[in-house]
Swiss-Prot record:
Family: Belongs to the SecA family.
Keywords: ATP-binding, Cell inner membrane, Cell membrane, Cytoplasm, Membrane, Nucleotide-binding, Protein transport, Thylakoid, Translocase, Translocation, Transport
Source organism: Synechococcus sp. (strain CC9311)
One Pfam family named in its UniProt record: P-loop_SecA
UniProt-listed InterPro entries: Helicase_ATP-bd, P-loop_NTPase, SecA, SecA_CS, SecA_DEAD, SecA_motor_DEAD, SecA_preprotein_X-link_dom, SecA_SF2_C
Alphabetical list of NCBIfam families matching this protein: secA
The name this protein goes by in its record: Protein translocase subunit SecA
Top-level taxonomic group: Bacteria
Amino acid sequence: MLKLLLGDPNARKLKRYQPIVSDINLLEEEIEPLSDDDLRRRTAEFRQRLEAAGSLDKQRPLLDDLLPEAFAVVREAGKRVLGMRHFDVQMIGGMVLHEGQIAEMKTGEGKTLVATLPSYLNALTGRGVHVVTVNDYLARRDAEWMGQVHRFLGLSVGLIQQDMTPAERRINYGCDITYATNSELGFDYLRDNMAADINEVVQREFQFCVIDEVDSILIDEARTPLIISGQVERPQEKYEKAAEVANALERAAEMGKDGIDPEGDYEVDEKQRSSTLTDEGFTKAEALIGVADLYNPQDPWAHYITNALKAKELFVRDVNYIVRDGEAVIVDEFTGRVMPGRRWSDGQHQAIEAKEGLAIQPETQTLASITYQNFFLLYPRLAGMTGTAKTEEVEFEKTYSLQTAIVPTNRVRARQDWVDQVYKTETAKWRAVAKETAEVHKQGRPVLVGTTSVEKSELLSALLAEENIPHNLLNAKPENVEREAEIVAQAGRAGSVTIATNMAGRGTDIILGGNSDYMARLKLREVLLPRLVRPEDDHRPPVPLQRSEEGGGGFSATAPASGPHGNAPSEAKAIGNLYPCQLTEETDQALVELAKQLVKAWGDRALSVIELEDRIATAAEKAPTEDPEIAQLRASIAQVKGEYDAVVKQEEMGVREAGGLHVIGTERHESRRVDNQLRGRAGRQGDPGSTRFFLSLGDNLLRIFGGERVAGLMNAFRVEEDMPIESGMLTRSLEGAQKKVETYYYDIRKQVFEYDEVMNNQRKAVYTERRRVLDGRELKKQVIGYGERTMNEIVEAYVNPDLPPEEWDVSQLVSKVKEFVYLLEDLQPDQLQGLSMDDLKAFLQEQLRNAYDLKEGEIEELRPGLMREAERFFILQQIDTLWREHLQAMDALRESVGLRGYGQKDPLIEYKNEGYDMFLEMMTNMRRNVIYSMFMFRPAPPAAAQATTA
């Protein structure tokens, strides 16, 4: 009703963009006839106009004025290089992003292409633009694919990947537009603020950032801080003993009247993800370990037991982690991907290693940390894209000051969302999923089944294998995860069945009939890899190919040939019938000749896998090239794609007529948004498609957040195990449960943000001080400033202004000054007699400056420049050591203030107040320690040093 009275605010916002879209369309006629060189020259012209404006504040209004012309130039470059023309709605999406908002654009509407518009415009300032994706694969794909547009227009494009060296990172961050993952950006920021030398710093000042899948990064991952850790030795046997004790303890089956079952040793709260020992549990655990008190500070055990119980009950193998090569590797709960190198903190990872009988790695201590919330707020301008932002609109606005605009689709949606089906048991649900998958598969339609864990995906895989239904598996298991792109490339083929763990945020569209462009590139890779790639580098994951005898459309799966570690041989071919047809003899022969020519040009097995893939990616571009080998490679890709296209187009028509992609959800996620992301895989760009969710009373959402009501209804109506319930009331009940969970997690994220905001202000102050030191500007002035403040603090500690001067303890004051500055050993108390408090401070500051000049003379005689090096070393050493200790102290404070809520005190206010006092004390200690270290610094003379060495 309110919308009817006041009008739709989103519609009003979009209406404002329409005249600008008209301007861009008019410019298209003017720009279309330009030569490639003339089009590129526009970039130089734009830059000259911006440079003439001067400061960034003056450039911003000019950027808005340049927008229509710049967007028209990018549209034309997209047509020439990618063969893709930005639709009008994509222009609107680009404007939303340029204004620093979130653009909600449905799956398949070309979000990746939209990002080229504001990226190009804001990169013209020369201050750098970051385009952020959720994983290395997508960052690489977008840098190669969309980077073509920017490179064509004369901008430099950088890419940050996990295995890059600092030197490579610095070069790539120095580019006009840099593609990177959220975690790499965050960790590089933290590492830069731990650097010992300015040359180790890789990032430059932040300016503009566009985040793809913004809800995944700013909402889903906001609860987890980025942490850089150092190792701390803890007794391994404690983890092993705790795991043994946890296995001997029994879980409370039901909650008693007081919240605890008297017959259980511990209770588990799945909602809070915590475990608590009962009184009986404490007694039993102490007896099993042979100690009198689990909380004895000299021999603490409680923390180890709590972590062991959580590892036993809340961290499930093949759901939360997988075991690979003797290590427990975390599985991302939102994307289903493994996260090698990441570890749970606070001893939790060690508890899981003990549970699984793995080698226990040393525990870690936090050296630096930041939440994604505070990291991305460092950007002066922040924007994001996603298919599902509206459900989190309030949080985006409150936490990040980001407004959300819903960009209309280019074509009307034709997808059908069928009603949820709820079963009493999980067994019945999985049978129903397998049955519907088989039925839709027989119709010749592709099916995508979304599961929530590796374990569930393998359960369904086994059920489908029993029915002889060919399928592909995409989950966190190493043999599957590396083949993600090619599995998705064929997920739209007629009759294909793909089981995927958490498709949310995977960033790859499923194209009906299959992706002929990717198939052609993979075919070239398969042919060239054995001839061009060094054998030792040829360790890419399995991609075995079995060619369909029919050589036509349709999907046939075959078991992959296994290599020595369960992986397929690395000549790398594609699982199942990836290629839609056999190539003609003429094309096959042309590929053989191409391989020979490239061996001559690039050497026999002389490239790395990445180098080969880079060259294939470059050849797949449409941008002009003067490299004869790349041109040859490009012609071969076009020849192969042409043959595949003929079959793929025909297959696409058949899939459309059959009803398009059918998406099956096997569990409601805690967030409605993630469910919508899965649904959004079907019906892209007006394609036909359908979706349905299959649920059971055993699903986590219903079990933890309110399944009793539904179970009561089913029992009341005596519903059979294999009979589903479909009802509006049930759907509303489920959505109500999801809203409860969303609110619960929003409160957690809000609390994380509020507490980290305290740390954030302190972090900014410390990192600003550190950067001053790294930049090396006025180091002496900085240290003397520390000394002057230290003198003031000594005076304030030993002089009481309320007492007459003759009662001041000047002797103690002088002794304390000499402790810090031994060069003032001749200072006598009578020199301070008769001075006021302010005069005392001024006198001691003057004495300190004189002493520091003397010290500098001593040190510089040994080697010019040594004093500045010492200043830099001691300041950085003290900042890093004390900041590390401060982080530990703040963690301990945060845990302890939680209990103060029982004393009618606000824990957050207590945390802020005490944290501030602790921070001031840390900074004071840092200044004092630097002054003490500088005056005590006595390097050996060069001659003495040489004699010692000899």
